[in-house]
Amino acid sequence: MKKFQGIFTVMMTAYDADGGIDRRGMAAMTRYLVDSGVHGLVVLGSNGECPYLTHGLQKAVIDAVVAECQSRIPVIVGINERGTEDAIAMARYARSAGADGALAALHLFYPLDEDAVFAHYEKLCEAVDIPFLYYNFPGNSHLLLTPEQIARIASIPNVVGAKETIFDVDEVRALVDATDDDFSVFTGRCLNLTQTMEVGACGAICPLPNVMPHKAVLLYESLSEGNREIAAPLQADFYTVGPLIAGSPTPHALIKEAMRQLGHDIRVEVKSPLPQLTPQQVSHVHNTLVAAGLLDD
């Protein structure tokens, strides 16, 4: 049986006026997503601005979400450290705080061969007793492994899944085929949830369910039941909101602005050096939400 499956929302990180973590805001987003029926939460993912948060801010995010969630659904913590020692330290904190899993990326500064990458994950998993997911995001991490190489990492005992933020559905299929049935292969994009579930993916780890959580859950459930008649228009709805993430390599502020326009009390500021929202992007977000039927013009 798979440890994790379904719609896991990559949460945005909410700040207060002083740049600290808005714990009330994080708690409110947690309640909203849990009540919307998503199957899990991911904090400190790539859309949670993790690479630009101090360890203190990261810990505050973990604490706020785990405390509010109260084990109603799993909370997975993004581990995005360049060095193995720091990755171990943050994974240990996540476990001690009550998180249910860790999504571990390895962002390269120096090129590493397959054995060095494997050794990093092996040391991480040996040091911390928590379920790990491998994060395959070559566009950001600059680490490009084949499905067979990822399957080798999957052989480490407490690696239970992988997030595949890639466009090639055949690579997702190859990873599914190369791993055991209880290994959870997630797509990192709701935009290809239909195609990836057709080849064996077990759900999505994605930020777009912040905007349409109910539809994301219904899309997943419809695909799981083989009901393409219901799934097809829901998948099309995600294509409509796709410009929120597809229109920028740094969509963090756009997604926050979408949430703000939909009534969530969240500041749209992001951590430097991420770009702040422009007036043109505010209009772009509004027009996208109108086109998706989520706002009136």
Predicted regions and their residues:
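Alpha-helix N-capping/helix-start residues
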Residues: 17, 23, 55, 147, ...
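Catalytic alpha/beta core domains of metabolic enzymes, predominantly
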Residues: 126, 138-239, 245-246
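A general structural signal for well-ordered alpha-helical segments in protein cores
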Residues: 26, 58, 62, 87, ...
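C-terminal alpha-helical cap/extension of soluble enzyme domains
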Residues: 6-13, 32, 36-38, 198-201, ...
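Active-site beta->alpha loop and helix N-cap motifs at the rims of alpha/beta catalytic domains
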Residues: 2-9, 14-144, 259
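Short secondary-structure transition/capping segments
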Residues: 53-56, 89, 114-117, 145-147, ...
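Short helix-capping segments at alpha-helix termini
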Residues: 67-73, 96-98, 128-130, 155-158, ...
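Short capping/connector residues at structural and topological boundaries
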Residues: 17-20, 114, 150, 275, ...
